[in-house]
């Protein structure tokens, strides 16, 4: 879906994010658009299923993965009306830096953003939420 790439370009434009994706989660979950060569382009249907699934407690204990990147859940309001967001942090491997991640949900899509090193999670959350609100108004 080439038209979705413009949304990714918009999310990446200010330089605060290192990765972004729009993922369809209804029927056959798949990545509609993502930053080429980054983590979110590799998100699997199983990972999407965990994000939107009914079990909201196991990932607090076990974490979850996005495109194979392990993440810790900080706040989960993804299925709550009016909030539709989840805040995560990547898990460090070998002392590497960790990054803030936000996932927001619309009727048909998940919007995912990963901030660059040192970018506050609140900034990522706000940007992700605003894109999801726009998509919701556009019937997505």
UniProtKB/Swiss-Prot annotation:
> Where is the protein localized?
Cytoplasm, Cytoskeleton
Picking any one GO biological process from the record gives:
negative regulation of actin filament polymerization
Q: Locate the cross-link: Glycyl lysine isopeptide (Lys-Gly) (interchain with G-Cter in SUMO2).
A: 54
User: Mind telling me which InterPro entries this protein's record contains?
Assistant: PFN, PFN_euk, PFN_sf, Profilin1/2/3_vertebrate, Profilin_CS
Where Phosphotyrosine occurs, the residues are 129
Keyword entries, A-Z: Acetylation, Actin-binding, Amyotrophic lateral sclerosis, Cytoplasm, Cytoskeleton, Disease variant, Isopeptide bond, Neurodegeneration, Phosphoprotein, Ubl conjugation
List of residues that carry N6-acetyllysine:
105, 108
Give the Gene Ontology MF terms in alphabetical order.
actin binding; actin monomer binding; adenyl-nucleotide exchange factor activity; cadherin binding; phosphatidylinositol-4,5-bisphosphate binding; phosphotyrosine residue binding; proline-rich region binding; RNA binding
Entry annotated with the keyword Acetylation:
yes
- What is the recorded post-translational modification? Phosphorylation at Ser-138 reduces its affinity for G-actin and blocks its interaction with HTT, reducing its ability to inhibit androgen receptor (AR) and HTT aggregation.
Give all Phosphoserine modified positions: 28, 57, 85, 138
Report the superkingdom from the record: Eukaryota
Indicate the impact reported for residue 117 to G.
In ALS18; uncertain significance; like the wild-type the mutant protein is detected in the soluble fraction of cells
Q: What does this protein do?
A: Binds to actin and affects the structure of the cytoskeleton. At high concentrations, profilin prevents the polymerization of actin, whereas it enhances it at low concentrations. By binding to PIP2, it inhibits the formation of IP3 and DG. Inhibits androgen receptor (AR) and HTT aggregation and binding of G-actin is essential for its inhibition of AR.
Q: Write down the PANTHER family for this protein, in alphabetical order.
A: PROFILIN, PROFILIN-1
Summary of subunit composition and partner proteins? Found in a complex with XPO6, Ran, ACTB and PFN1. Interacts with ACTB. Interacts with VASP. Interacts with HTT. Interacts with SH3BGRL. Occurs in many kinds of cells as a complex with monomeric actin in a 1:1 ratio. Interacts with ACTMAP.
- Protein name, entry field: Profilin-1
Instruction: Provide the taxonomic classification.
Output: Eukaryota, Metazoa, Chordata, Craniata, Vertebrata
């Amino acid at each position: 879906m080439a038209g979705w790439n413009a949304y990714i370009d918009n999310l990446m434009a200010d330089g605060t994010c290192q990765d972004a994706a729009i993922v369809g989660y209804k029927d056959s979950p798949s990545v509609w658009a993502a930053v080429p060569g980054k983590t979110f382009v590799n998100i699997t249907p199983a990972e999407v299923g965990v994000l939107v699934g009914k079990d909201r407690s196991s990932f607090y204990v076990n974490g979850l993965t996005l495109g194979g990147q392990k993440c810790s859940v900080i706040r989960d309001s993804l299925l709550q009306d009016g909030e539709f967001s989840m805040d995560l942090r990547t898990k460090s491997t070998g002392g590497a830096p960790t990054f803030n991640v936000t996932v927001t949900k619309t009727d048909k899509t998940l919007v995912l953003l990963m901030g660059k090193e040192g970018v506050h999670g609140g900034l990522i959350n706000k940007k992700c939420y605003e894109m999801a609100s726009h998509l919701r108004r556009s019937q997505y």
